[in-house]
From Swiss-Prot:
Belongs to the tropomyosin family. Homodimer. Heterodimer of an alpha (TPM1, TPM3 or TPM4) and a beta (TPM2) chain. Interacts with HRG (via the HRR domain); the interaction contributes to the antiangiogenic properties of the histidine/proline-rich region (HRR) of HRG. Interacts (via N-terminus) with LMOD2 (via N-terminus) and TMOD1 (via N-terminus). Its main location: cytoplasm. Keywords: Acetylation, Actin-binding, Coiled coil, Cytoplasm, Cytoskeleton, Muscle protein, Phosphoprotein. GO terms for biological process: actin filament capping; actin filament organization; cardiac muscle contraction; cellular response to reactive oxygen species; in utero embryonic development; muscle contraction; muscle filament sliding; negative regulation of cell migration. Residues 1-38, 116-136 are annotated as: Disordered. The modification Phosphotyrosine is found at residue 261. Disulfide bonds: none annotated. Binds to actin filaments in muscle and non-muscle cells. Plays a central role, in association with the troponin complex, in the calcium dependent regulation of vertebrate striated muscle contraction. Smooth muscle contraction is regulated by interaction with caldesmon. In non-muscle cells is implicated in stabilizing cytoskeleton actin filaments. It comes from Rattus norvegicus (Rat). GO terms for molecular function: actin binding; actin filament binding; cytoskeletal protein binding; disordered domain specific binding; identical protein binding; protein heterodimerization activity; protein homodimerization activity. This is Tropomyosin alpha-1 chain. Pfam families: Tropomyosin (PF00261).
Length: 284
């Protein structure tokens, strides 16, 4: 009888231990499942971060590409501005040469006008001499008349020359006015061109500053891309580690489930043995 009681106590103790182990196995299983879910959540979070890192890398790559395109456009604008400056300098030189030629034509016209005035004075003096001789010497009337006709012819010729010179003078004055107007326009244009040149120079300096700024940004983007690449590698490593951890935990869960099943079988066997013992006691 004592042996049976002792055996029953041992069976009860084994049953309690089996229950404790079963509960512990259940707790371990739940903890493993919680840890597995936590790792799965971390894996999803890491995958999202990885996707965000890839998107950010694409964004910086696109920004770097835009910066390079803007830099190329700035260099093209600077080249075009230099070509415009050279063209404007050539135009200024042509205007200055045309102004010099106009001034030379004006000086020639003034000289011809002075010569015409001298010829007119000489003609007037000749007519006075002829008239004086006509008054003093009537016997030489025919000669004087001839001389008078000649003088008139000379005077008429001089008048024609004077009119022609005057007409040419008007034309020359008109040319001079146009030349002065063109000179004023040229001076105004030169001032505008100088102002445009200053603007182009300032724009060129601004473009150079922007190019330097873009170069600095490019270095910064390259450094950020390098940092992001390192973070990407680190995230990939963590993701791989998390996947391996999940695999291990899944295997641990399977092992725990197997152990739980074995404990249940053992508990069932102990319960059956305990029932048999109770039946034996009842029979006694």
């Amino acid at each position: 009888m004592d042996a049976i009681k002792k055996k029953m106590q041992m069976l009860k103790l084994d049953k309690e231990n089996a229950l404790d182990r079963a509960e512990q196995a259940e707790a371990d299983k739940k903890a493993a499942e919680d840890r597995s879910k936590q790792l799965e959540d971390e894996l999803v979070s890491l995958q999202k971060k990885l996707k965000g890192t890839e998107d950010e890398l694409d964004k910086y790559s696109e920004a770097l590409k835009d910066a390079q395109e803007k830099l190329e456009l700035a260099e093209k604008k600077a080249t075009d501005a230099e070509a415009d400056v050279a063209s404007l300098n050539r135009r200024i030189q042509l205007v200055e040469e045309e102004l010099d030629r106009a001034q030379e034509r004006l000086a020639t016209a003034l000289q011809k006008l002075e010569e015409a005035e001298k010829a007119a004075d000489e003609s007037e003096r000749g007519m006075k001499v002829i008239e004086s001789r006509a008054q003093k010497d009537e016997e030489k009337m025919e000669i004087q008349e001839i001389q008078l006709k000649e003088a008139k012819h000379i005077a008429e010729d001089a008048d024609r020359k004077y009119e022609e010179v005057a007409r040419k003078l008007v034309i020359i004055e008109s040319d001079l006015e146009r030349a002065e107007e063109r000179a004023e326009l040229s001076e105004g244009k030169c001032a505008e061109l100088e102002e445009e040149l200053k603007t182009v120079t300032n724009n060129l300096k601004s473009l150079e500053a922007q190019a330097e700024k873009y170069s600095q940004k490019e270095d910064k983007y390259e450094e950020e891309i390098k940092v992001l690449s390192d973070k990407l590698k680190e995230a990939e490593t963590r993701a791989e580690f998390a996947e391996r951890s999940v695999t291990k935990l899944e295997k641990s869960i399977d092992d725990l489930e197997d152990e739980l099943y074995a404990q249940k079988l053992k508990y069932k066997a102990i319960s059956e043995e305990l029932d048999h013992a109770l039946n034996d006691m009842t029979s006694i």
